Amino acid sequence: MIQLQKPRLILDNGLRLDGRKPDEMRPIKIELGVLKNADGSAIFEMGNTKVIAAVYGPKEMHPRHLALPDRAVLRVRYHMTPFSTDERKNPAPSRREIELSKVIREALESTILVELFPRTVIDVFMEVLQADAGTRLVSLMAASMALADAGIPMRDLIAGVAVGKADGVLVLDLNEPEDMWGEADMPVAMMPSLKQVALLQLNGNMTPQEFRQALEMAQKGIETIYNLEKEAIRSKYAELKEE
């Protein structure tokens, strides 16, 4: 059996393998209204990670006995396309995809005003087109933008980024090698204007001091992403006004 050797993640010059500084994020691109048949849609790119999200609803729930009398039902599906990774993925839903669908649904339920739409259903679909770490957060943000594109009332947009530990150094917005070989990975998503956490998970080990520093790093990154999200919405509506 071939033993894979852990690569150095932080080089002698203090930079990461992809040339970024420890507190530097990958380039971000957001586009709304990319699917004409969905009520709302968005593509969210963070480096080489690329996710498309589509929203349908609120619409009448079928069968009706599954409807809730006081709120909308939120159905969420996170799926990685077979061509999203280096090795072709089995198209059947994996345990990880089912788990992440639940994690993302719970985060979205904290921001959508589901109580405004009793006896209805809102469907959210996310397809990972390219995966290079951070797919849960990019999918969550793509879904948040697609919901905004659909005009569904929310308490706030969701912005998120992961902070990890690579060769003992805290790094912002992990790439695939850092995700695979690093000592810790902490995805954080927030509703920034409300200063509320929508998602926080920690895999690996951090000291209490590192955890506090990681949270501060994440908050700075989230503020940058949040501004880009708002700008993407403004751009979309500026285009609609011109039409």
Curated annotation (Swiss-Prot):
Entry EC no(s): 3.1.13.-
Family matches, as NCBIfam families: ECX1 (TIGR02065)
Protein name (database record): Exosome complex component Rrp41
Any one GO molecular-function label of the UniProt entry: RNA binding
Pfam family name, one: RNase_PH
Tagged with keyword Transmembrane: no
GO cellular component: cytoplasmic exosome (RNase complex)
Keyword presence, Aminoacyl-tRNA synthetase: no
Domain of life: Archaea
Subunit and interaction comment: Component of the archaeal exosome complex. Forms a hexameric ring-like arrangement composed of 3 Rrp41-Rrp42 heterodimers. The hexameric ring associates with a trimer of Rrp4 and/or Csl4 subunits.
Function: Catalytic component of the exosome, which is a complex involved in RNA degradation. Has 3'->5' exoribonuclease activity. Can also synthesize heteromeric RNA-tails.
Protein family: Belongs to the RNase PH family. Rrp41 subfamily.
One record GO biological process: gene expression
Keywords for the protein's UniProt record, in alphabetical order: Cytoplasm, Exonuclease, Exosome, Hydrolase, Nuclease
Species assigned in the record: Sulfurisphaera tokodaii (strain DSM 16993 / JCM 10545 / NBRC 100140 / 7) (Sulfolobus tokodaii)
Annotated localization: Cytoplasm
